[in-house]
Design a protein with these regions (language model features):
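Disordered inhibitory propeptide/activation segment of secreted metzincin zinc metalloprotease zymogens
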Residues: 1-35, 144-156
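Acidic helix-start/capping segments at beta-turn-to-alpha-helix junctions
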Residues: 25-30, 57-75, 134-136
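A short alpha-helix/helix-coil micro-patch that ends at or immediately precedes a cysteine
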Residues: 26, 31-58
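Catalytic zinc-binding patch centered on the HExxH motif and its immediate surroundings
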Residues: 36, 66-91
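Sec-exported extracytoplasmic/periplasmic mature domains
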Residues: 45-53, 117-125, 169, 185-188
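Surface-exposed patches in mature extracellular/periplasmic domains of secreted proteins
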Residues: 49-63, 124-131
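Short pre-active-site segment immediately N-terminal to the catalytic Zn-binding motif
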Residues: 94-113
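The catalytic-center signature of Zn2+-dependent metalloproteases
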Residues: 106, 113-174
């Protein structure tokens, strides 16, 4: 059974500068299986469908965010960082061996949208207790040096389907739910 956090959508102190609009370029490394190009396009489409001031486009080189193969020894599905200097974090490491290639436009797209979310400043909705989505012992990521700011207008009630929960079950699809849409709209 999955439990969820008691407060939901969070962002970092630093965000991507968008002004009146900004398009972020994303590249999928050729070291990743072809299914990841499909998944990248699906993740980008999820964001662009929200009509935000931040938009995304897939490119083959010169990207602001590169989706790259994680080391074979990686013990995570994927890992991104947080924005600095008004720019997105520049890399997401993806453990394609652990994720596989099935369900690129749902499961894999959810993972990529989640990591892109980190790159533009979204925290785990259950950062205060990862056991809500991951199980196991209580694990608080804390505000760290990047901040954990509750996004206005998002609920303090449980929301088990956010795209920014820390963990995801194999094969699950988490498109943006209504609370995610509010968070995206408030921030971007």
């Amino acid at each position: 059974m999955m439990r969820v956090g008691t407060e939901e959508q969070y962002r970092t102190t630093n965000l991507v500068s968008v002004g009146t609009g900004r398009t972020i370029s994303v590249a999928t490394s050729t070291a990743l299986p072809a299914a990841y190009v499909t998944a990248t396009d699906a993740a980008i489409a999820r964001y662009n469908a929200q009509n935000l001031l931040i938009r995304f486009v897939r490119v083959t080189s010169g990207a602001e965010i590169t989706l790259a193969q994680a080391p074979k020894s990686a013990r995570y599905l994927a890992s991104g960082g947080f924005p600095t200097g008004g720019n997105p974090y520049n890399q997401v490491l993806i453990n394609s061996g652990a994720i596989g290639t099935a369900n690129p436009s749902t499961y894999i797209a959810t993972i990529l949208a989640h990591e892109i979310g980190h790159c533009i400043g979204f925290r785990h909705t259950d950062y205060m207790d990862r056991s809500f989505s991951c199980g196991g012992a209580v694990s608080n990521e804390g505000a760290s040096t990047v901040g954990a700011i509750l996004i206005p207008g998002t609920p303090s009630a449980a929301d088990p389907n956010s795209w920014m929960l820390a963990c995801i079950g194999s094969g699950n699809d988490r498109p943006f739910n209504p609370n995610d849409v509010i968070a995206l709209g408030v921030v971007y």
